[in-house]
Amino acid sequence: MPFIPHTEDDVRLMLDTIGVESIDALFDEIPAELNTHPILESVPKPQSEAATLRLQSARAREGDGRLNFIGAGAYEHHIPAAVWELVTRGEFYSAYTPYQAEASQGILQTIYEFQSMMAGLMGMDLSNASLYDGATALAEAVLMAVRANPAPRGSTPRVIMPATVHPAYREVVQTMVRHQGIELVEPSFCAKRGGVAVSALNLYADEPVQALVIAQPNFFGQLEDVDFLTNWAHKRGALVIGVVNPVAMALLKPPAAWGEKGADIACGEGQPLGVPLSFGGPYLGFLSCRQALARQMPGRIVGRTLDQEGKEGFVLTLQAREQHIRRAKATSNICTNQGLLSIAATIHMAMLGPEGLKNVALTCHRRTQQLWQRLALLEGVERCFEGPFFHEVAIKLSKPAEEVLTCLSGVNIAGGYAVGRRYPGMENVLLVCCTETKERSDLDHYADALGLIMSEQGSAA
């Protein structure tokens, strides 16, 4: 946005008025070691608008034609052109929070439809109007579960979050609960199946537990034994939180049908539903639950009602939020949601329909199966884990994954995610994702390129 910068005289006048010697003095509470952090020195100097445009255009061209096989929480799907053509209409794009219900019926109804679709996809009774992203949705689900299922007096609330849950999600949850007296425990995964290790889980069999988090599919792309895990948790009085891929739920058993009683809360990342990758955001989180937990649900909820004349209307309801009640009594201190992106997800799901979304999920799975069948024939490549997967597969290489990715990048292929970045000891493991955006020729190209790299002697580099 064009602006006229402050002159030196303007700055001096403002500093003198507030009694401060210099601009740096305004920030003297920041420790010196943070002000001289190496990452700050790497930030480039300001550039003109024209120079910035040239730089960004050049970087955009670098990505042209690159085949993307990276997943690990953010997935490349085809988005019908009509989705963002509609989302960017002024009525959606620039509208603010619909506090005034009588003037916001269109947006309120659209959000209500989002809630209905997500609740239906999860098999749950209700959904909220979205949260920031999948990680914060899981964090809110954990807080929600601890409120609904408090620990015995005198004991610390405990939530089991296995190592198969996305590591970034675990970090965010840890950040949000660290100072709220909640203990997070992370049982390890089974080296054979890539799912939650039952032996590690049973270490807490006789301990009070408030909730168990189950990722489906998990970070490695593997499908967990959700029925066993759900029954294990409920038998011990713990609530079950499912953190799931919404596209996968069109094909797999929904959280509400897990085990004998079903999961209590379902959450996850809604980015696969019509939201571009966009360098990691903005995305949207979703959160749904059973009716019994409705009062613990954070975030906005749109309800449908009748006015005094009997006409249908939509309103914000159950607003137990920090901007409406005392902060200490609020269910959440996240004071906004991703309304625009939830509208995109609504339009995307409406355009695909139940069968269309199921076909997308099925195509993703088939493409990944086909890719693995090709990769299985290569020298120095094997499955890291046994058992079923959805649209990501972890493969073990005879060379370091980072080096292999560098070589693949040289032939314009984003080859996957190096698992060793997050899991020490798995430096040779590559997580490869394949969605409906890939054709058979793309799979062949990837397999041929990887095969050539793996057949070379010595280092992949």
Swiss-Prot record:
It catalyses: N(6)-[(R)-lipoyl]-L-lysyl-[glycine-cleavage complex H protein] + glycine + H(+) = N(6)-[(R)-S(8)-aminomethyldihydrolipoyl]-L-lysyl-[glycine-cleavage complex H protein] + CO2. The keyword Amino-acid biosynthesis does not apply. Pfam families: GDC-P. It is an enzyme of class 1 (oxidoreductase). InterPro entries: GcvPA, GDC-P_N, GDC_P, PyrdxlP-dep_Trfase, PyrdxlP-dep_Trfase_major, PyrdxlP-dep_Trfase_small. Keywords: Oxidoreductase. GO terms for molecular function: glycine dehydrogenase (decarboxylating) activity. CDD domains: GDC-P (cd00613). It comes from the Bacteria. SUPFAM superfamilies: PLP-dependent transferases. Disulfide bonds: none annotated. GO terms for biological process: glycine decarboxylation via glycine cleavage system; nucleoside metabolic process. The keyword GTP-binding does not apply. Its EC number is 1.4.4.2. Belongs to the GcvP family. N-terminal subunit subfamily. The glycine cleavage system is composed of four proteins: P, T, L and H. In this organism, the P 'protein' is a heterodimer of two subunits. The glycine cleavage system catalyzes the degradation of glycine. The P protein binds the alpha-amino group of glycine through its pyridoxal phosphate cofactor; CO(2) is released and the remaining methylamine moiety is then transferred to the lipoamide cofactor of the H protein. This is Probable glycine dehydrogenase (decarboxylating) subunit 1. The gene is gcvPA.
